[in-house]
């Protein structure tokens, strides 16, 4: 009897680092159901779109992609081959059954908190059902997700993401996360430590803890006391082989003393912090429901820099929020000048349906948003390039992560997240080596062995 060919799944990931982690865990759940991953959509028996709902027109982009996959499914049907189509992630959560109504070729819609049920859902799909699973059973998800095989962890590389917290209770008026990811939920300490230990045992050298509001994480520690993220980082730093720790994304209101002390006292906690502020105008910050002022943010950065003088800062900015005046925008520019960011992400405000911001008056014209964004990005780019140039001639610990794009090269990563191009003979993947920065590229550094 001829053996049945293995089923293959193609997962396309949109958006944030947590979606990357979620896609990996979907792959783990499907591996237990007999699927192997493929990078070629033409080979797939199942196509999953793991979607993001943060930016404007996110849903329309998904529907456009589904149109292309629908045509592929029709061609497969003519040839007598089945192709299943699924939509996962935050667009799935927000749109629900509307996805199947608008795109009937879709077989399943599964939210961020229910993808551990994929094998059961697929069994029902093969029985002829169309499935929409979008509840918020987050504890159930992490309790039931299968662990990846060691070989799969090794294949993914020497850096890894580890989700420790999901959801957000801040309700910033521009943001859909509380509606698509739910309220804040923290994973238990034992579960996080066990996953980090498995990663380290498989050769992972750097772990980035993920959460929509990661520094709101809290849980009962191994000593029975209530822990925050700082105490968790101290515990993870004890794991043999785990040389580097990071976390993202944070809210200024949840940067407590213990977390700041972790930056001071833990060599393995990298001196890089992504701490979004969104605006430098107190009036706009209030309208955004950020619950801090520009002065609060700057004072917090002073405390963090006093604890870790070599820390590099990253941020998020939104320009053109409803009611933003030229004076408000200039306040943002002034805050950026004061902070001097090593890197940052900046966007035009885009109204998200169902959020308070979308209902506010005095929306800023698109042309003015464009002009302000260009001015802000020019300043941020100048600061980023200045930070890179300041490292030329210095000796830096670099984690070698992967082969380079060019023959004879490998790519490493500085403590401040910049890619570093080195000679392939400088070290093996997973090594942390000392290099001397020789020059800068547009988004990377070049180095030689120190």
UniProtKB/Swiss-Prot annotation:
Gene3D superfamilies, alphabetized: Methylthiotransferase, N-terminal domain, tm_1862 like domain
Binding site for [4Fe-4S] cluster 2: 168, 172, 175
PROSITE patterns in the record: MTTASE_N, MTTASE_RADICAL, RADICAL_SAM, TRAM
Binding site for [4Fe-4S] cluster 1: 16, 52, 90
Reactions accelerated catalytically: N(6)-dimethylallyladenosine(37) in tRNA + (sulfur carrier)-SH + AH2 + 2 S-adenosyl-L-methionine = 2-methylsulfanyl-N(6)-dimethylallyladenosine(37) in tRNA + (sulfur carrier)-H + 5'-deoxyadenosine + L-methionine + A + S-adenosyl-L-homocysteine + 2 H(+)
Enzyme class at the top of the EC tree: transferase
This protein's GO CC annotations: cytosol
Main localization (coarse): cytoplasm
Record note on cofactor: Binds 2 [4Fe-4S] clusters. One cluster is coordinated with 3 cysteines and an exchangeable S-adenosyl-L-methionine.
Every Radical SAM core domain range: 154-388
Keyword check for Ion transport: no
Cofactors that this protein relies on: [4Fe-4S] cluster
Function: Catalyzes the methylthiolation of N6-(dimethylallyl)adenosine (i(6)A), leading to the formation of 2-methylthio-N6-(dimethylallyl)adenosine (ms(2)i(6)A) at position 37 in tRNAs that read codons beginning with uridine.
Annotated PANTHER family: CDK5 REGULATORY SUBUNIT-ASSOCIATED PROTEIN 1, MITOCHONDRIAL TRNA METHYLTHIOTRANSFERASE CDK5RAP1
Family: Belongs to the methylthiotransferase family. MiaB subfamily.
Name this protein carries in UniProt: tRNA-2-methylthio-N(6)-dimethylallyladenosine synthase
